[in-house]
Amino acid sequence: GLVSSIGRALGGLLADVVKSKGQPA
């Protein structure tokens, strides 16, 4: 559903942010 799609998108965005913060830029 729409909510699931939004949740998945937000989850992916959060994962990307955490990954970039965990690595030296």
From Swiss-Prot:
Pfam families: Antimicrobial24
InterPro entries: Frog_Litoria (IPR032021)
Primary subcellular site in the record, as a coarse category: secreted
Domain of life: Eukaryota
Tissue expression pattern: Expressed by the skin dorsal glands.
GO cellular component term of the entry, any: extracellular region
Keywords attached to this entry: Amphibian defense peptide, Antibiotic, Antimicrobial, Secreted
Annotated localization: Secreted
GO annotation, biological process: defense response to Gram-negative bacterium; negative regulation of nitric-oxide synthase activity
Task performed by this protein: Antibacterial peptide with narrow spectrum of activity. Active against the Gram-negative bacterium P.multocida (MIC=25 ug/ml). Inhibits the formation of NO by neuronal nitric oxide synthase with an IC(50) of 9 ug/ml.
Family designation: Belongs to the frog skin active peptide (FSAP) family. Caerin subfamily.
Listed name of the protein: Caerin 2.1
Organism (species): Litoria peronii
